[in-house]
Amino acid sequence: MRFLNSIVLGLAAGSVLLAADPTFLRRRVPDIAPAACDLTANAKGSAYRPAFGIGDPDARQLKGIARYGELTVAPGGSSAMVSYPAEEQIYYTLDGNGILLYGDERVPVKKNDYMYLLPGVKHGMANESSQPVRLLVMGFKIPPGTEMAPTPKLMLANSDDVKLQPVEGHGPTSLFKLLMGTTASRRDKLAAASQMVSLFIMDFAPGGTNIPHHHEMEEEIYYVLRGRGDMVAGGGADGNEGRYPAREGDAFFIRLNATVGFYSGSQSGDHDLVLAVRSRFPFPRVRD
């Protein structure tokens, strides 16, 4: 009997070790405990909540995305200065006013400002205001051997200045603000990035949707900026969608080829807003 129990326990342990990788990850960002990281090392008044990637227990599930989390800098505080030789980053300011430290520059930033941060350039965030500044930090791995087209200067814009427009394939009830694309982009406000292919805001009419779909070459993260609804993450062979309640502050990471989308939960009033970012999956290079 003792021998049989040992076998059962061993099989149970093996099943845990061999658990299938998740199709998506879900995080309630305000509920994430702050964690120490390079952005907060020896820094005064800064806290980082790791949602996905570095600092999160499921970091290995992300292949091309290095990190995604929320940085808060208190009044009079500052983050550490950081630099990554093989990672491009985007900051998106959720609330408050701060000072972006970028190389030798000190650039004031406000709510809804977003910016592209080149690999190898030291950067951080300071706060000289009377209220906290809160921002999303997004990092994307640069594969070895990738040729970068450097941006001539700091690229920064505000999403309030980007027009809403329809995007083919996503229906009439969602409009898009195309914030940032690659250096080859001709449609985005900023053409800046290498591996990050699209940063955008979706504006949903009450009861609207962007029509669930999938991406064969990219990972994606949705972050609910305002409102509530149902997040679509994954689906079955019968066409049924995996739908999960989502509200402001919720974030979802979606693997490539998984069904992704959003259904607005609003019936009237303010439109629901979702900030989304897609980046290339680092497929192995084919050698000649």
Say what each PLM segment does.
Residues 1-8:
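Bacterial N-terminal signal peptides that target proteins for export
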Residues 9-20:
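Hydrophobic h-region of N-terminal signal peptides that target proteins for export
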Residues 19-67, 80, 132, 139, ...:
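A short, N-terminal "cap"/entry segment at the start of jelly-roll beta-barrel domains
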Residues 59-62, 79-84, 126-127, 188-192, ...:
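Short histidine-centered beta-strand/loop micro-motifs
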Residues 78, 82-111, 221-248:
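A short beta-strand-loop-beta hairpin characteristic of the jelly-roll/cupin
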Residues 97-99, 122, 132, 228-230, ...:
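Structural motif
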Residues 102, 109-128, 140, 246-266, ...:
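Conserved metal-binding segment of the jelly-roll/cupin
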Residues 131-147, 253, 268-286:
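A short hydrophobic beta-strand segment most commonly corresponding to one strand
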